A protein has these predicted regions:
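Glycine-rich, aromatic-flanked loop segments that form ligand/cofactor-binding clefts
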Residues: 72-73, 77-115, 242-257, 300-324, ...
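Carbohydrate-binding surface patches
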Residues: 242, 644-687
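Glycan-recognition surfaces
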Residues: 419-458, 502-609
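Aromatic-lined carbohydrate-binding/catalytic grooves of carbohydrate-active enzymes
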Residues: 325-461, 475
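Polysaccharide-binding surfaces and accessory modules of carbohydrate-active proteins
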Residues: 5, 10-13, 17, 21, ...
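Short Pro-Gly-centered flexible turn/kink motifs
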Residues: 101-106, 283-302, 737-745
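C-terminal beta-sandwich/jelly-roll accessory domains of carbohydrate-active enzymes
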Residues: 671-748
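Conserved, mostly hydrophobic/aromatic
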Residues: 18, 164, 288, 334, ...
Length: 748
């Protein structure tokens, strides 16, 4: 059993392979958080929190005559509001009189096999009985509000998931102005916060800063998890590295506006509260109604950032991603967007596909512009019927020609949006989110459809399902190209307008559920102007997400590096694009572009017909190499060997099979130097006592100052310990952005 309860001491212990999570019901019935970290044995953990009378930290009423028991000082599992804890709260609730307050006490608990599920929200699932569930029931007597704290314990994964379920068992309505998913109080000490900020075309840039005495907030108010901050953070010891130091991860399974707050208290405790963004949130909870919060995924690693990342990678691959595509190699695709933009017809697309097929590409994806009057981004969104001027005869003649080449066919959609210049908007202007009496802000010339309305979800499900039923479409790229503003729904009364942004997200999830369950063999790829909705919530429906609209290989190094802290490479959409690059104007060798894109789903986004003969040969070889290495890249352990933001010379990363049978080292020189220092690297994830052969050395885009006779060469053999601790030195690399791939195979 991974969940134990000591009824005498009233202590819960959740255990995974390498961690312990301890909670205690105190004398007043409050659920206290005692410990989360490396596995420990028995012992009185309340001694960590001795009774102390601190000025201006009020005591519970029961302790008013012998002070020192204050909610402001105790570590708590889920905090109420306005009852004496002045740190971050999980909940703000008002009763029908306008009185704010909640103080939850223990009622009962149950332990169940398997994993809890949430109503209308994506969450982790159990595989082969690899999870247990703890439900702790608590009650606020004054309001009749019941709180169920949900814990999913994945023992072998070293993961604990959490969510909260709130039910109004009182006689009058309540209003939730804040409803966080989880609170985590961490022990005394100095901590660093790692978070992943950015902007469009420059997502998930790692930033590391000390946890101070202020409140540090990572959030989005944009209606999506956003390009600007990712709903994932790490708290680690200040001296933690990739291979040492205690590290805690907190990841939300949510794709809408969210908020993750970190606060260091007056006594040095650090509290993390994660949940739905409280700005513009107000949920009415009538008697008998229940509200589920989004899920949070917690993980702890005692030995650095790399094992923490690997725990998340395995968990997301196994217990977040679903459907037949999660464990399969994805087809190598070509997308026409950067080759044609809106200017295409059947002949152009077939010509691109013919060249791609001759080089080994497996799928042709038709991007934006195939529907309605969509000749630019001012019109057509919402009208999911084929533009027969561009595609005479519709989609079927094009698909038949693509399939005749031995290729699959995929299609771009953006179901959540509408143009004012569209038949859908002219028919249903009330289906767009706009404020009464105001001209709305426009993003990419489009408005957001009101997916809080079931009839809008039904329309979209019907229109997209019709496309998938009537045409042989094997891939869908689901885009979302603006942030939400002017949020107001004409389907709900004034008192429910604070529910709309969350109801919108529930509508998106309902639509994604209907489409992915209705067409399980279709490969869905998420997108939101690139990586604007790259989160665990969307990964429950799509096994891959377009990582960024920035396809520049050198820029992608920092984007994919930051993404890798929480998300596996098999979820990162990555393509080889044209040069000069359309976002930066940079020219990079085509093989270096491929080395970077291979650490993702791998595909192409350019007109292959414009390549030179040598580049076409390179593309053929890239595809063969990717297919050969894909199992290792997709399922192997990922290691960050350098930080591209700190190492101006080169960026290196590595994959190793979990059983240590093979490894792949990748390196890109980002700033070639005269008379450079040696490139010295040690491998990771190998078996010390094994023997490995260097059976693949590929240098791309480089020029050598001279031959190195005594350097590394193909066929050399090394012990695992030599590669792990002595390492290898690579030859000097010159030219513009050269790259290297080294492959090792275990031979004994």
């Amino acid at each position: 059993m991974s969940i134990r309860f000591d009824s005498e001491a009233r202590i819960f212990v959740l255990e995974t392979a390498h961690t312990s999570y301890h909670m205690k019901v105190d004398a007043l019935g409050h659920l206290l958080h005692l410990y989360y970290g490396k596995t420990i044995g028995t012992g009185d953990l309340m001694q960590l929190y001795p009774r102390t009378d601190r000025g201006f930290s009020p005591d519970y009423y029961a302790y008013r005559t012998h002070r020192g028991v204050s909610p402001d000082l105790l570590p708590q599992e889920y905090t109420g509001c306005n009852v004496g804890d002045f740190r971050l709260s999980c909940l703000t609730v008002a009763d029908s009189r306008g009185a704010f307050g909640a103080d939850f006490t223990y009622v009962s608990h149950t332990v169940e096999a398997g994993k809890y599920q949430l109503t209308g929200l994506p969450c982790a699932h159990a595989e082969e009985n690899d999870a247990e569930t703890l439900i702790v029931r608590m009650q606020d007597e004054a309001t009749g509000l019941t709180l169920e704290l949900l814990y999913g314990v994945f023992a072998q994964q070293d993961v604990i998931t959490r969510a909260a379920r709130l039910t109004n068992h009182g006689d009058t309505p309540l209003r939730l102005d804040k409803a966080a998913s989880a609170c985590l109080d961490l022990p005394f000490g100095r901590w660093d916060l790692l978070h992943f900020h950015g902007r469009h075309a420059m997502e998930r840039q790692l930033e590391r800063e000390a946890v101070g005495t202020n409140i540090q907030t990572i959030s989005s108010v944009r209606g999506s998890s956003s390009h600007h901050n990712n709903p994932f953070l790490i708290l680690c010891q200040q001296d933690a590295t990739e291979t040492s130091g205690a590290c805690y991860g907190v990841m939300m399974v949510y794709s809408g506006s969210y908020q993750m707050d970190v606060e260091r208290s007056q006594t040095g405790l650090v509290r993390v509260v994660s949940g739905i963004q409280e700005e513009r949130f107000a949920w009415n909870l009538k008697p008998g109604e229940t509200f589920d919060t989004p899920e949070v995924i917690l993980s702890f690693a005692a030995e650095g950032l790399t094992p923490l990342s690997q725990q998340y990678h395995r968990f997301l691959r196994r217990n977040i991603c679903r459907g037949p595509w999660r464990g399969k190699r994805r087809p190598v695709l070509i997308n026409n967007w950067e080759a044609t933009y809106f200017d295409f017809n059947t002949e152009k697309i077939v010509k691109i596909a013919e060249k791609a097929a001759s080089l080994g590409v497996e799928m042709m994806v038709l991007d934006d512009g195939w529907f309605g009057t969509r000749n630019d981004d001012n019109q057509g969104l919402g009208d999911w019927v084929v533009n027969c001027e561009k595609l005479p005869g519709g989609l079927d003649p094009l698909i038949e020609q693509i399939n005749a080449l031995g290729m699959k066919f995929g299609l771009w959609i953006e179901p959540e949006m509408v143009n004012e210049n569209s038949q859908l908007y002219r028919t249903h202007p009330d289906w767009a989110l706009t404020l009464p009496g105001r001209k709305p802000a426009m993003g990419r010339n489009q408005l957001v459809l009101d997916l809080s309305r079931p009839e809008v979800v039904d329309y979209l499900a019907g229109a997209i399902s019709k496309l998938l039923r009537e045409h042989h479409i094997e891939y869908i790229k689901w885009d979302m190209n603006r942030s939400m503003s002017d949020v107001y729904s004409r389907a709900f009364p004034a008192e429910q307008q604070g529910e709309i942004m969350h109801r919108y997200m529930l509508g998106v999830y309902a639509l994604a559920e209907r489409l992915t369950q209705g067409f399980p063999e279709v490969l869905f790829e998420g997108c939101a102007g690139g990586g604007g909705r790259f989160d665990a919530g969307m990964l429950c429906y799509y096994p891959q997400i377009w990582c960024s609209d920035d396809t520049d290989a050198i820029e992608r190094l920092t984007i994919q590096h930051g993404t890798s802290f929480g998300y596996p490479v098999c979820t990162m959409g990555a393509h080889v694009s044209a040069c000069p690059n359309h976002q930066t104007g940079r020219t990079t060798p085509i093989d270096t572009r491929a080395v970077v894109a291979m650490s993702g789903t791998f595909g192409y986004e350019l007109d292959l017909g414009k390549l030179k003969r040598a580049e076409c040969t390179a593309v053929k070889n890239q595809i063969k190499r990717f297919k050969r290495l894909n199992d290792l890249i997709r399922t192997g352990d990922y290691y960050r060997l350098t930080d591209p933001a700190e190492n101006a010379y080169f960026t290196a990363w590595q994959f190793a099979a979990e059983d240590g049978s093979e490894a792949l080292l990748n390196l890109v020189v980002t700033h070639p130097q005269a008379n450079p220092l040696p490139i010295h690297l040690c491998f990771r994830g190998l078996k010390e006592d094994a023997v490995y052969e260097l059976d693949g050395i590929d240098y791309f885009g480089s020029r050598y100052a001279h031959d190195v006779e005594d350097g590394i060469h193909k066929g050399m053999r090394f012990s695992g310990s030599t590669l792990l601790y002595a390492g290898l030195v690579l030859p000097q690399l010159f030219g513009d952005y050269p790259s290297v791939q080294l492959h090792l195979t275990r031979k004994g």
